[in-house]
Amino acid sequence: MNLPARVRVTRPPLPLAPALKAAAGRLCPDAPEALTGAALAIAGGGVIGAHLRWDGGEAANVETGWRGRGIEEALAQAVSG
């Protein structure tokens, strides 16, 4: 999948480190503490997208300026795989 040059998608280990947890919580505020999966999009050292999964649900969000560039799809693929 082609992403913008500055963007990388990663599956960090769980539980998320405090800084990643705060950034993911900003993007997906309804996500619970206990996650079963997470994929984050990073650009310029900051989290610009998150796809979080937990027992009984999931949430995804990408910062407005980065939407429509394939990041949503890359996050969904990463959290599933």
Task: Set out the residue ranges of the language-model regions.
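A short, internal acetyl-CoA/4′-phosphopantetheine-binding micro-motif in the GNAT/acyltransferase core
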Residues: 59-71
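A generic structural motif
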Residues: 54-55
